[in-house]
């Protein structure tokens, strides 16, 4: 067997015994096939295995050719935000709910993984969003999102008054609970629940979805991925404001801050089995009607 990968990382934070068992089986399977295996240190102690290599997620990104994420999309998003900083490919075994980003079925994962490790795969690059919050004193907070950047109030059902500019041109003003700015990857997540369109994963676009707008004419807007979105607040907003990245990183705001969202230079490098079909994934996960 030709080795396309020499060092493989196992990552993910298992919540269930079934997921933990998959970690153990995967480690044993890879070691028996002669791979150098590094387990994420946050999960290594739960496995209770002897003589294992473990390290931080960042060091797995530096040292490994491939990372296998065991879990659902939440685990994938958490790992991918860090791993996207490094030259590493990522594939997932689904131990969550929907699993849009975790291709491998746990029942057939090892056969699928054998084929992938034998070279039967293709690579798909998914772009990330970068959000930059410029404070009144000139300092900036910067973070990234794979699915979406969300502007929202700190409390439920609080209206926010703001303006949206695209490439320095005024686009629209908004009075709503917030705004979702989504990648194609995120278009099947929170964006979809808010009434946004599904964007094919390879599309170079992002979508802006108002959250509970106080108007009947507000609709989602699809723009080019090279666009820069600028959010400007109505002064003296008394509500607590926040920016959320993939619902995992929360950044505090005030009405004097300026928000810029654009395509990041980072990419998520996903590995897919050769028989992967995006539309089959949509049909399966969203329970679309089958062919006649």
UniProtKB/Swiss-Prot annotation:
UniProt binding sites for NAD(+): 73-74, 147-148, 158, 175, 177, 188-193, 248
Key words of the record: ATP-binding, Cytoplasm, Kinase, NAD, NADP, Nucleotide-binding, Transferase
Catalytic activity: NAD(+) + ATP = ADP + NADP(+) + H(+)
Enzyme class of the recorded protein, top EC level: transferase
Pfam families associated with the record: NAD_kinase (PF01513), NAD_kinase_C (PF20143)
One of the GO biological process terms: NAD metabolic process
InterPro entries found in the cross-reference section: ATP-NAD_kinase_N (IPR017438), ATP-NAD_kinase_PpnK-typ_C (IPR017437), NAD/diacylglycerol_kinase_sf (IPR016064), NADK (IPR002504)
Biological role: Involved in the regulation of the intracellular balance of NAD and NADP, and is a key enzyme in the biosynthesis of NADP. Catalyzes specifically the phosphorylation on 2'-hydroxyl of the adenosine moiety of NAD to yield NADP.
Protein name: NAD kinase
Species the sequence originates in: Buchnera aphidicola subsp. Baizongia pistaciae (strain Bp)
